Structure formats: C-alpha cells, structure tokens
C-alpha cells in the first residue's frame, strides 16, 4: 500500500481556506488517530516557538506526557511531526485571518478585514506568532521539507488575496490597472515585515502603522473611484 504523504489529511493549500480547525480533523477517528491529533496539537506551540532544531525530544515528551515510543509510533520521525504541527498552526492562522471576511460583499473591505485580522490577532492563534514567518526564517537554509511546506502556505495566502482582488476588478470595485498578485504580495510583505519589526522591538506600533498605511492605500489607489460613493 502506498504511504500517504505527510499530513493528518490530504492538505491542499489551494482549497483549505474556509474551514475551522475542528473541521480540519472532521470525521470519526480511531483511538490512535485521536492520540496522533493530540500529539500534534501539543507539539505545535513548541515547534512554532522554538523551531525545528530547537525542539528537543524531552520538550516533546514533557508537552505530550508520552515517552519517545509513544510519540514516534504515530510518526515516521521528528520531521513528519514538525510538518504536521506546521499544518495545524498554519490552519489556525488561516482561520483567524479569514474571520468575518466572507460576510463582506465589497472586495476592498474584504482585503481590509484580512489586514485587520492579521494585526488584531498578531498573525496567529498558536503561541509564537506567525507560523509562516517562523518556519520560513528557520528553514531558509535548513529543512527542505518544512521550507517547501512554508512556500506552499505562502502561495495559498497569495492566491486567496489575489482571488479577492480579481473578483473586485470583475465587479468594478477595484481599478482594472491593479495586478492582483502584485497587490497581494505587497500586502503580505507589508504585514510580515511590520510583524518582524514589532517582535524585535517589542512594540505593536509598526503593525498598527502598517494597517493604517494599507487601509489608506487600498482606499486611495485600489478602490475604483465610482465605487467610493456607493
């Protein structure tokens, strides 16, 4: 039988976007699957805070209350556990960033809401902050599997924003000259950069400045002029 790829589900970064973390593991699970889920849930904050290299076996044993054999009977090794922990952390971040977005009919308002969610939730709902930033920085010259996972997560986020922008252009809410992907990359880069500065300086002001600047740009340069009076 062919071994399934890493992940508690067949995770597609282009489609996993509108579901809560509870739905992430939806379905009837065996006792072993429940244990595996619980290990991932408890390991996720460790990997997000300490990184792949910094998370030791003793850390995992302390967090899960299991011995080495009890942990790795469910995973092929530390890399698989770290990958599934990233999936879990990223899905929680995605769920938070999309909160309330679908309720807004206007495309620019949707983009602004995602900016607000990022800033207000500090980019993630797992201790340690944004799992994408944390994993990308650590894995840049390190673990290839985790780096590829982070790259796919980034692409899914870019695609999500791009779809909103493209829909706005189609509905004449956004100027047709706007390039959805470039706009999406700029928004993400602004937020992640501001988050990095805020974390280093232990000051949330850079994030709030980024929010203000992004909102202003979206209203002045992205929202189509005729749509402003609606």
Name these PLM-found stretches.
Residues 49-53, 104, 125-128, 171:
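Short coil/turn segments at alpha/beta junctions that flank glycine-rich nucleotide-binding fingerprints
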Residues 110, 124-145:
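Amphipathic alpha-helical segments used for helix-helix packing
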Residues 34, 38-45, 49, 63, ...:
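Alpha-helical structural segments
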Residues 176, 180-184:
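Membrane-interface starts of transmembrane alpha-helices
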């Amino acid at each position: 039988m062919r071994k399934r790829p890493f992940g508690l589900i067949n995770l597609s970064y282009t489609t996993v976007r509108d579901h809560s973390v509870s739905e992430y593991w939806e379905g009837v699970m065996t006792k072993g699957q429940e244990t595996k889920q619980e290990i991932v849930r408890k390991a996720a904050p460790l990997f997000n805070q300490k990184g792949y290299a910094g998370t030791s076996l003793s850390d995992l044993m302390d967090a899960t209350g299991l011995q080495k054999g009890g942990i790795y009977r469910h995973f092929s090794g530390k890399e698989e556990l770290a990958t599934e922990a990233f999936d879990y952390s990223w899905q929680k971040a995605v769920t938070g960033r999309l909160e309330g977005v679908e309720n807004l009919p206007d495309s620019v308002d949707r983009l602004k809401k995602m900016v607000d969610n990022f800033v207000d939730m500090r980019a993630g709902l797992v201790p340690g902050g944004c799992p994408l930033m944390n994993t990308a920085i650590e894995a840049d010259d390190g673990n290839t599997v985790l780096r590829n996972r982070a790259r796919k997560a980034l692409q899914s986020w870019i695609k999500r924003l791009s779809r909103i922008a493209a829909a706005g252009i189609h509905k004449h809410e956004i100027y047709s000259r706007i390039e959805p992907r470039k706009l999406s990359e700029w928004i993400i880069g602004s937020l992640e950069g501001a988050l990095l500065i805020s974390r280093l300086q232990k000051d949330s002001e850079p994030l709030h400045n980024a929010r203000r600047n992004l909102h202003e740009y979206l209203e002045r340069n992205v929202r189509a002029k005729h749509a402003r009076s609606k």
